């Protein structure tokens, strides 16, 4: 998670790691519980730091190519074990309960750009990808609000 101000400046970053959930034989129910609790902690952290808008990757836009996400067995297992729809729905519900405005952002290219920016920003790849998602969301909001103002004057 990256917390940005209205100008797109990073104010804070927070990452939750739990690599064990992708291990072969790790119980799916326990993995789900770990993911959802981590998401709750991140949203609580954002709430108590004055965040009002949350941008989530629109995970439904991530498509698999030929039934595979990547070319490695380990990567394919991780992708197939990841309950993206469930996590997104739960995240949206929890964010709305906390009073956040919620927007979904097309994640296309965010990981690649995040990887490229990570060295310059001195952040890990996940935090820099979250930064890119935040910038895309802020750009959408600024563009959308600008077009709404134009509509009011017509």
Predicted regions and their residues:
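Positively charged, helix-rich recognition surfaces that bind polyanionic ligands
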Residues: 1-154
């Amino acid at each position: 998670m990256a917390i940005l101000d209205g100008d797109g400046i990073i104010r804070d970053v927070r990452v939750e790691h739990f690599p064990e959930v992708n291990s072969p034989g790790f119980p799916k129910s326990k993995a789900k519980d770990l993911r959802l609790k981590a998401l709750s902690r991140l949203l609580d952290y954002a709430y108590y730091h004055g965040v009002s808008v949350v941008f989530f990757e629109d995970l439904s836009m991530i498509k698999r190519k030929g039934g595979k996400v990547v070319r490695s067995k380990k990567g394919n297992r991780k992708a197939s074990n990841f309950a993206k729809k469930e996590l997104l729905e739960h995240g949206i519900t929890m964010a709305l309960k906390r009073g956040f405005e919620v927007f979904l952002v097309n994640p296309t290219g965010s990981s690649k750009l995040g990887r490229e920016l990570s060295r310059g920003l001195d952040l890990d790849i996940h935090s820099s990808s979250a930064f890119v998602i935040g910038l895309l969301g802020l750009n959408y909001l600024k563009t959308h609000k600008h077009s709404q103002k134009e509509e009011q004057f017509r």
